[in-house]
């Protein structure tokens, strides 16, 4: 699909019936709308031509041969003549046969069918959204129980039951069909009783996502208060924790539906899309035998059962209601097998006891459509190596080993050597590269400075699995990566490998610079949450950097750790050695960092740093812990985390804060980042 900015993109998610019709429907010159597959046939056994309205129908999917209709008439594709685009006899469009790779059809289901991915996969999205046990929903979907759901009509209901599930009275399942006549039971069933996937669809259609979000949040807060108080019963406390975890998942699911603007009722199918014929082919092999994709057989199974249900509903006045519900169950099972064979237990097999490959089997795993066909090809100008952390790199940079860089950029390097008259021809340039002369590395750095590279970590599950970086030459044999980009790749530094690709064309380089650079992909494309966040190594480093060594004036007057910047006196008290420290005073952060570089203080050693006058400190009502007077009349008011130096006239001369070198370094990094952002923002404006 193409968005409003003309960017090609792939979006996977529930689709509305209107969108499925828009994908498949075509209007013939006579006004007939085609696109629905109604027959379970593929090719005629005598003519070997696709059956009309079947799974390989040329009217729906396009011609088998370019420009030739089913009648055999030929017309030049793209001719400027005002000839009709469709054949008047067979209704086949005169287009290229490649249309059969993307032109879809659809099956209009006689009854709604739940999408098995959203019902049976764990966690079950439908069960979480409706707050119902999965076992009860399965009984409802597969017509094992009834549901007294909200009636379709707005008139008073027969039993005065609205918007609630009933599973307790199992005898109704047998008593109601026997009590009513067929016609009366049909009227009662359509008005009062909802069963199958239709009941799920009604419940999902009536669900307000914002109300679900608010109610779940209120319940989560109430359970949090109960958990703090405690019930005294371990079993009840465990139930509360499980319920809280469930509510968190339910709120996250509701947020995802709201952000992506997807209606929950789309998880129940009314129209079943039919894949293009070229993606589920029938091939003729030696001996005249045919080999068909398993998906064709599964589609035929769905159409057979769906047509049977349509006939039963057309004559429902003479058909028992239980027979109709049994056929609805068969349709639901056929749709489940098509989407994910074996997800409900025993998979469906053919006559040779071989399991059918469903749609899920075709696209998932290493041998699936995405990973094997689209993402699993080996290409030139690519390499692979282990990734390690690069703490000195910027967010948009990556460290590229020399051995990999000199191979990937060899073509550009040869061009640079010849252009700068270092080599007269390609042979001499290659010999200089093999000898690895110093001039080679200088030109290589110039080439890499203007050429981005692409890093990819398999499996590429979303677009952040491939990002662009500015390469930097490193001496190591591993690729150095900034730790902030690891979450987008779902990577860590325990032996993961990444592939390196070089974009060659100007269009690819422009796309890498404008769209794929790592500093331009800070938010998740799915839900909009920040994805470049500190994790693992960075969190541990920040913790060690800012933990300090017993910060606070009381804990630091006598410290068991060594202090290098002052004269220390060792005191023996109760067989423990204490060191009486002289406080370290620094006029600025530069003085503090200089003292650290000279190894006069440690990274976590507490010190007093002169700070700007802060009205919050001046107006504070905190009582000083200690007051120290000097011989000239000045005195120090020492508080827990700051110190005020006053003159004889009690005026504030300086304010010192209690901090460490780690805090100072962290603060300066944040300050420089904010200033750089403000400068860049003002430059853009």
From Swiss-Prot:
It is an enzyme of class 2 (transferase). This is DNA-directed RNA polymerase subunit beta'. Binds 1 Mg(2+) ion per subunit. Binds 1 Zn(2+) ion per subunit. It comes from Dioscorea elephantipes. It catalyses: RNA(n) + a ribonucleoside 5'-triphosphate = RNA(n+1) + diphosphate. In plastids the minimal PEP RNA polymerase catalytic core is composed of four subunits: alpha, beta, beta', and beta''. When a (nuclear-encoded) sigma factor is associated with the core the holoenzyme is formed, which can initiate transcription. The keyword Nucleotidyltransferase applies. Its main location: plastid. PANTHER family: DNA-DIRECTED RNA POLYMERASE, DNA-DIRECTED RNA POLYMERASE SUBUNIT BETA. One of its GO terms (biological process) is DNA-templated transcription. Keywords: Chloroplast, DNA-directed RNA polymerase, Magnesium, Metal-binding, Nucleotidyltransferase, Plastid, Transcription, Transferase, Zinc. One of its GO terms (cellular component) is mitochondrion. Belongs to the RNA polymerase beta' chain family. RpoC1 subfamily. Its EC number is 2.7.7.6. HAMAP family: RNApol_bact_RpoC1. Its cofactor is Mg(2+); Zn(2+). Mg(2+) binds at residues 492, 494, 496. Zn(2+) binds at residues 69, 71, 87, 90. Pfam families: RNA_pol_Rpb1_1, RNA_pol_Rpb1_2. GO terms for molecular function: DNA binding; DNA-directed RNA polymerase activity; magnesium ion binding; zinc ion binding. It comes from the Eukaryota.
